[in-house]
Every structure is written in C-alpha cells, then in structure tokens.
Amino acid sequence: MDSLINEIKSAQSSAELEELRIKALGKKGILTAQFALLKNLDEEEKKEKAKELNQLKGEFEREWTLKKEIIATEELHKKLLEEKVDMTLFAPSKGVGSAHPVMITMERIVDYFVSLNFAIKSGPLIEDDFHNFEALNLPKYHPARDMQDTFYFKDGMLLRTHTSPVQIRTMEKETPPIRMICPGAVFRRDYDLTHTPMFHQVEGLVVEEEGKVSFANLKYILEDFLRFMFGEVQVRFRTSFFPFTEPSAEVDISCIFCHGEGCRVCSHTGWLEVLGCGLVDENVFKAVGYKNVSGYAFGLGVERFAMLIHAVSDLRAFFESDLRVLEQFR
C-alpha cells in the first residue's frame, strides 16, 4: 500500500492517476482482491481485516483526490498559457457587409419626406388591372399603356409597373388629408444601360380639401427636395403629359457634372431629367370616390438618383453582385 501512495505522490498527469485508481480499486485491483478474500475468514478475522482494508482504502482515496486536484490545477494553468491570445497582434481582416447604394439612396429620399411628416405606405407587388391602370386614368386600350411594358400572369394579374397603385389603395381606405410616400420595387420589360426589369421608385401624394393645394406647393417642396439631394442646383419644370396628373411636368436639374455647361452625361444640354409630377387628375379622384378635393403627386426612380450621385453610367452594375463595384460605395 505504501508503494501505491508513493506512486500517487509522484504522478505527473491525470492519466497516470487514473491508472493507479484502476490498479487499486478496479475489478482486478489490489484492494478489490483483498476485499474479495474476506469471505474465506471467520467472523472475528473478517471484522478485523475489513476494518484494516477500509482504512487503507480511505487513505488511498484521500491521497488520490488531493493529487487529482493539484494535477487538474496545473494542467488548467498549462492549457491557459498555451492558448492565451496576444491582444497586441493584428487580427486577420474579415469582410464586413454594408448597405447597397440603391438602398442608401432610397433611405435618404425617404428621410427627407418623413421629416416633413409624410407617412410611408406600402402595397402588393402583384396587382390587378384596376389599381395599376384603370384607377389611374388608364382605361383598357388607352394608348398611354404602351409607355409601360408589363409582366402579366395568365389570370390577368400583373407585376406592378409603378408604385402608384399604393396611392389608390390608400385613398380607398383613408379620407383626406393625405400626405404619403410609397417607396418600393416595380417591374417593366426593359433591359439596357439605363433600365432593368426590376427597379425602385418613390412616389408621393398629397390630398387636401379643394383649394388648399396648388402647383406652387408642389414646386416649392420638389425644389427643396432636389437641393437636399444634389446641393445647390438650378431646377426647372417642363410641361409634360401623364394620364394621372393634369397639369403635368417633368423636372430637371442643372447638370451636377458640368454645372450646366454641357457634357456627355447631360447630352450637352446642361440639364438632367430627374422626376415627374403634377396635380392629381379629377378622374383619379372619381375612381376612389373623392369629391371636392385637390392634390399633387410626384414620382422618381431611385436608381436614376443613385446613378447621378455615384456617377455610374451603367445601371446594371448595381444588380450584378460584383463586389469590386459594390465595395466602392461603402
């Protein structure tokens, strides 16, 4: 037994200790074998021998437990030293995600109008003909429908070609005054340097009692908005046509690249077209059951703004998932 105790004291690892435990108390261990022999003794001898063996077993277990705690502490300390981290070392760089340039631009646009208490509204991407066309003064066979190549489903439903249906759905549910914007994805069958089948719009609508809203209000807010987005630019309004507004206008800003002098980007005109607007047509109000109201609406392409802000000539670069391109906009 003294030999086992000495071996415990000289053990250097948990593995050595475990071997000693098995040697003493395992199925074929020294003490286990001694306990098995007790059955061959008479009662008096068995009692004396059992007492002696229990004392030896207790001594072994105390020494073994004490040594186990010492070795466990030493092994933990050694492990911590081996696995310690030098906080002064440079960590390997990891790729960090960032917002997409189109989403950054959309958020900036939305932030401006939210600051003026415009509510943000949303609607379904799959629309019916009424909300996408008819309610917006575009009845069946109207020639203006040719302006938008539409994705149709077999049941007559379609992918919305603009976010204007959200305005119709909002007016169906709410009564004036209305002050809203509807940012979101839209879809048209077009794909070239300046068009993709899916892109994003932000449209706005203001409806008040008749006589409370004029083109002057629309002009003021859009001029302020465009200077918020592009800095101190000149803004001009050109008469145009949209089925859902009357009168209608296209809005241009002085070229932010040549400052109005004329360059390739602005086709040497000194102006960049950025959005469309107008006073809401009476037929649109009739479609939603509004009477004695007036209002204005406007709409812009988010990608168009992003292209101008970041000087990108090919719209498709935003959607081709080329990290070499997208990393430039962090």
Curated annotation (Swiss-Prot):
Cofactor: Mg(2+)
Free-text comment on the cofactor: Binds 2 magnesium ions per tetramer.
Major subcellular site: cytoplasm
CDD domains named among the record's database cross-references: PheRS_alpha_core
UniProt keywords, alphabetically: Aminoacyl-tRNA synthetase, ATP-binding, Cytoplasm, Ligase, Magnesium, Metal-binding, Nucleotide-binding, Protein biosynthesis
Gene Ontology MF: a single term: tRNA binding
Catalytic activity, as annotated: tRNA(Phe) + L-phenylalanine + ATP = L-phenylalanyl-tRNA(Phe) + AMP + diphosphate + H(+)
Binding site for Mg(2+): E246
Signal peptide: none
InterPro entries xrefs: aa-tRNA-synth_II, aa-tRNA-synth_II/BPL/LPL, Phe-tRNA-synth_IIc_asu, Phe-tRNA_ligase_II_N, Phe_tRNA_ligase_alpha1_bac, Phenylalanyl-tRNA_Synthase, tRNA-bd_arm
Organism superkingdom: Bacteria
Xref: Pfam families: Phe_tRNA-synt_N, tRNA-synt_2d
EC nos: 6.1.1.20
HAMAP family xrefs: Phe_tRNA_synth_alpha1 (MF_00281)
Protein's name according to its UniProt entry: Phenylalanine--tRNA ligase alpha subunit
Origin species: Wolinella succinogenes (strain ATCC 29543 / DSM 1740 / CCUG 13145 / JCM 31913 / LMG 7466 / NCTC 11488 / FDC 602W) (Vibrio succinogenes)
Gene encoding the protein: pheS
